[in-house]
Curated annotation (Swiss-Prot):
The gene is Slc30a5. Residues 540-574 are annotated as: His-rich loop. It comes from Mus musculus (Mouse). This is Proton-coupled zinc antiporter SLC30A5. The keyword Ion transport applies. PANTHER family: PROTON-COUPLED ZINC ANTIPORTER SLC30A5, PTHR45755. It catalyses: Zn(2+)(in) + 2 H(+)(out) = Zn(2+)(out) + 2 H(+)(in). Disruption phenotype: Homozygous knockout mice are viable and fertile. However, they grow poorly and display lean phenotype, muscle weakness, osteopenia due to impairment of osteoblast maturation to osteocyte and male-specific sudden cardiac death associated with bradyarrhythmia. The lineage of its organism: Eukaryota, Metazoa, Chordata, Craniata, Vertebrata. Zn(2+) binds at H449, D453, H591, D595. One of its GO terms (cellular component) is ER to Golgi transport vesicle membrane. Gene3D superfamilies: Cation efflux protein transmembrane domain (1.20.1510.10).
Amino acid sequence: MEEKYGGDARPGPGGGLGPVDVPSARLTRYILLLCLTKCLKAVGLFESYDLLKAVHIVQFIFILKLGTAFFMVLFQKPFSSGKPITKHQWIKIFKHAVAGCIISLLWFFGLTLCGPLRTLLLFEHSDIVVISLLSVLFTSSGGGPAKTRGAAFFIIAVICLLLFDNDDLMAKMAEHPEGHHDSALTHMLYTAIAFLGVADHKGGVLLLVLALCCKVGFHTASRKLSIDVGGAKRLQALSQLVSVFLLCPWVIVLSVTTESKVESWFSLIMPFTTVIFFVMILDFYMDSVCSVKMDVSKCARYGSFPIFISALLFGNFWTHPITDQLRAMNRAAHQESTEHVLSGGVVVSAVFFILSANILSSPSKRGQKGTLIGYSPEGTPLYHFMGDAFQHSSQSVPRFIKDSLKQVLEESDSRQIFYFLCLNLLFTFVELFYGVLTNSLGLISDGFHMLFDCSALVMGLFAALMSRWKATRIFSYGYGRIEILSGFINGLFLIVIAFFVFMESVARLIDPPELDTNMLTPVSVGGLIVNLIGICAFSHAHSHGHGASQGNCHSDHGHSHHAHGHGHDHGHSHGFTGGGMNANMRGVFLHVLADTLGSIGVIVSTVLIEQFGWFIADPLCSLFIAVLIFLSVIPLIKDACQVLLLRLPPDHEKELHIALEKIQKIEGLISYRDPHFWRHSASIVAGTIHIQVTSEVLEQRIVQQVTGILKDAGVNNLTIQVEKEAYFQHMSGLSTGFHDVLAMTKQMESLKYCKDGTYIM
C-alpha cells in the first residue's frame, strides 16, 4: 500500500495519478533504463556546453525548443486528442512557456559559467530532494534527524563548490568571451554577477542554485495545469510550441544584428539532434514512465547516482583524445582544454551531493507503523511503536539557531563564552584576511592557531548549553556532568599543547633559528588585547575553581546487631550550594590564559631579538610558557578526575562528618550504614544512606530530620532507605544465611544503648 499510493501526483499517460504495482523483474528493467537515460543526458549536456561556445544562448534554446516541439507535437498530437483548450487555459499555457524559457535561460547560462560537470551536480536534482531540503530549512516538520543530515550534506556540497573548487578559468580572464557580450541580455546577467563581487564560475553556482529552486517551483505549479489540459505530455508539447513562437522574434533580431560564429549550420545538425533527444525528449519521457511504474522517491534515488557518476567520468575524460570518437562535434585530437577541470573540491562536493540526494529522497517512515500488543481494561487498543516514533519533531534550521542563541544569551557562563568566541573569530578572520593580502605565512599560521583555540571555546559553549538540558528517562541525573567532561578534555588538550611546545622549544634551544620579526609585534599585541578581555571575563571561573570533587563516604565499624526491619523512603533536596567547581569555565579560562602567555612570550622574545639579537630568547620563552601551561592545568585535571571517580567533596568533608555524628543522636534511630556522598556537578552534591530505626518510630519524622541535617551539610540530592526489624525477619524467612545478614549489618553505626538502657548486641 505504501508503494502503491506514496508516489508523486504527476499524471500518467492516461491521466491517472500515482505509481502502479510492477513485478520486480520489470521494475529492474525500468531502473536500468532510467540509469541509461541519465547517463545519456550527461552526454547531451556536455555536448551542449561545446555548442554554446559557437552558438548564442538564445539561438541555442530556440533550436532545442523547436526540435522538442516538432517531435512532441508529431507524436502527442495535442490538437487532435483530448478536450479542446479554452482561452483561459491558453493564457496559462503562455505563462507556463514564459516561465520555462526563463528557467532554460538561467540553466544554460549557468552551464556556460560553470561547465557541464558542475551544472549536472547542481541542477540535476529531483523535485522531492529539493522539497525535502526546503522543508528541513524552513518548516518545523522536516522529517527527522536523517533529513536534517541530508540537508546539511547538500549545503556542504554547495559550499565546497563555492570555496574549495579551483575552477578559476573564467576568473583569470581579463574580459569575458566575445560571444557572450553580443546581446543586452547576457551583458545584463554578467553585470548582475559582477555586482555580487564573485568570480563568474562562483556566480554560476549561485545562479544554478536559483534556477534549481525555480525549476522545482515551476514543476509544482504545473501539476494542476497539466491535469486541466489533459496530461503532462500534452502540456509539455503545447508549452514547447508556444516557447518557439515566443523566441522566434528574438532570434530573428539577433541574427540580423549580430555576427554569427558558426561557419556551417549543417555541421551542427547531428550535435543538436543529440542534445534534443538526450536532454529534452528521452529524459522527459523516461521520468514520466518511471514516476508511474514506481515510487517517485525510488526514481530520485536511482536517477541521481548514475548522472552524478557520469558527470565525474565525463568531466575527467571529455576533453581527452580517446573520447573524440564518442563526440558529435569535430575537434582535433591534440586539442585539449583546461576549462572547468576536475578538482578535489568538486569531487568532495559530488560525494556530498550523492549522499544528500539518497537521504533526502528516502521516504520518511517515522511513526508510520505500530504493533498491536493488546487492549486496555476499557477496550482501547494498545500499540507498540519502534524507532523514530519516539523522536521529537525536528525544528527548522533558522528556528533551531534562534532558540539556541536565546539559550546561549540567557545564562552568564554561556553568554560570556559566546561573546568572547565572536571576538576571537573576528580577530582570527581579520588576521587571515590580512595574511592573505600581504602574503604573510606567519599571520596565516597564527590565524589557524587562533581558529584551533576557537574550537575549545565552541566545545565549552556546547557544554554550557547541554548542562541545562532537562533530565530524561535515559539520563535521569540530567547533563550537568557535561561541564566536567568538557573541562577534563580541555585540560588534556592543553597538556598535549604544552608537551609539543616543550619538545619544539628544546629542539630550538640546541639550534636557535633566525626569525622574521616584522609582523610578530603587531599580531602579538592584537592577540594580547583580545586575550586580556577574555582573562577579565573568565577570571571568576578560576577563582571559584578550588575544592570541587566528587567522592563517596562510608563507615565500617564491623558491629553485629539484632535483626532490624526494613522500610523504604527517599528524601530529595535540590537547592544550590556554593563552592562547586565549574570545570568547563576553568578549562576555557586556562585556554585563554595559555594564549595570553603565548602573546606575552612572543612580545618579550621579539623585543630581545630586535634589540640584542638573542634568537635563543624565542625557545626560552616558549619553554617557560609550556611549563606554566602544564602547571596551571594540573589542578583542573586533578579536580576533574576526582569528580569523575566520585570522591567525597573536599569542601563538604568536615560538614558531612559532623552531620553523621548528629544523625547518630536522633531519637529512634538505631544506626546507619552505607553512607555515600559525591559531587555530581557544580550545583549538585548527591548522597545515599541506609538508616535503621526502631519498630515504633514514625519513619517520615526520621527521614525529615536526616534530610535536614544532610542538607545543612551541603547534600542537595539525597536518597534515604529506612530499615526496620521486620525486614531482617523477612530475610531470615527467605532462608538468608547468617553471613548474608551479617553482611547487611556489618557497616552499621550503633549507639550501643537504646533510650531505655537496653544494650544492643
